[in-house]
Amino acid sequence: MKIAFHTLGCKVNQYESEAIAAAFEQQGYTVVDEREFADVYVINTCTVTAVADKKSRQYIRRMKKVNPDSVVVVTGCYAQISPEEVSAVDGVDIVAGTNEKSHLTDYVAEFQEHGMRQLHVKGYEELDAYDETGLVVNTENRTRAYIKIQEGCNRFCSYCVIPYARGKVRSRGLSEIVAEAEKLITGGYREIVLTGINTALYEMEQIRPDEAGRLPEEPYGVEKVIAALSDIPGDFRIRLSSLEPAVVDADYVKRLLKYDKLCHHLHLSAQSGSSQVLAAMNRPYDREAYMDIVSTLREADPYYGLSTDIIVGFPGEKEADFEDSCSLVEECTFCKTHIFKYSKRPFTKAASMKGHVAPQVKNRRSDRLHDVGKKSAEAFFAENKGRMERVLLEELLEDQQMITGYTGNYIKVYVPYEDPEAAQGMLNQFVSVELLEVCRDGMRGRMVEK
């Protein structure tokens, strides 16, 4: 039996699709490319924007056309938020919510036996237990592995549907995280990326200040995971997929700087550069608090890599607010700025707010901010010119005779090579590279040692 996957959305979805694939392989399935003929197709959906919903529906229809007799399984956030809408799409056989992914092998077997369409979706208030999908240890042609450490979010930002799609905060057991990391490192992975719906919330519900208001001196929260993984022997590095300034502050990120294996890069989601808009978004920090975190990191390491998310066209966003977002991106010299046009989502407070921004204004602001973000990244790359960086080599661009990889501070580096066989042997290796000049979406470099 053959099974194919199409995954939309975030790194958590990618991780979960790999875990689901591993579970089906244990049942004797062969995983094939989504464009190939398969007996089962799994679409792992996203619902962060209306565009994501539309893409999910398109892929459902597309996969059924490849094999009209296949079993089509739709899971993920869109399936959780709009199960009836997903069920109504022609060709869908099984709809499974976000906390049902570990049961998909059973659901498919049941469908193949009885041929009855299935709907397995709990209400978000019932999503209160971590759904352990098992260890992901596929090491074929890979250098970077993702480990999911937590599920859910309780922040309820006014624009965001994800708390309804993912449920309450649930943290994965530390022993399971360490066991997965050890297997991945033993299997040859050189970079472990810690991911989750809101990684900063890992075990934070258990933390209480003492009577003097002091927080624990020993590692807590996501730092606890970093400390445990740092003790694993081997030549590898750890990367945090993101930290929310809505959860952590400058004092907390300062604690993370002592871990040598932790990459000097952080995705720090701003969402806006305007304190007024941040308040309307129900983000519990202002621009000044965000900049305090940035300053703390850059004072410790002027070349610390930062990336971010910005929403343009949030209800009530004025031109001055938008200019605040532009200036934030300029000042922070982000290595990458992800830009989203505000999209009205079900169940959210922002959907009923006054002052919705016209589509053409959102488009104009998005285009402008893309230009600002590109210049911000180029400025960050230029600051790194002439530096020596340790690069993990990942991919050969044979038609260009380039080998590419990433620095710890998340700069994509292009290094020319002459001997294809030797270059192939350097994949998944750390090498020292001199960063020479801004190039494409990163920098061109010169290898100084193998």
Where on the chain are the PLM-derived regions?
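Proteins enriched for Cys/Gly/acidic motifs involved in redox and nucleic-acid/cofactor modification
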Residues: 1-202, 218-221, 251, 266, ...
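Glycine-centered loop/turn positions within well-structured domains
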Residues: 102, 155, 167, 200, ...
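Short flexible coil/turn linkers enriched for glycine and charged/polar residues
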Residues: 140-143, 153-155, 262, 272, ...
